[in-house]
Amino acid sequence: MSKKGLIGVQMSTIAPAKMPSFEPFEVMGRLTDIGFHCAEVSQVPMTKENVAGFRKAIDELNFNISSLTASIDPMFPGMPGEYLSNEDDYKKYLDDARTLNVDMFRIGMMPMNAIGDVQKCIGGGITPPYSNNTVIYK
């Protein structure tokens, strides 16, 4: 991928909930057709099939996944999902990121119990002031 800056698409704008059928390779192909070559993956279930579809787009379309959206903890206690605070989920996040050549996670929103508590934010990997809530891992 070029070293030039890229203008991409945030997947939440075309996520599965907004489309009757969602197949990552097909969607990335359509984005490529209209001039986009980069996306942040957000609000897309990271199933094996979806990760494989994104990987295929990287390999065959020269598509770039700039970042993945991640959650530190459930927004509310008991809320289902994958969270960086869970060791197995954390490993899956890292595996998905490595598979997709991604080195950034975007934290969309802190859990409700951390809002207004700088120490909880720092403990969750966010350094105030946090611009776009991005956490870079290496």
Residue map of PLM features:
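Boundary/entry segment of secreted carbohydrate-active catalytic domains
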Residues: M1-E23
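Acidic-and-aromatic substrate-binding clefts and catalytic sites of carbohydrate-active enzymes
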Residues: A15-S21, V41-G53, D73-S85, M112-D117
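Aromatic-lined substrate-binding rim segments of carbohydrate-active enzymes
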Residues: K48-T69, P129
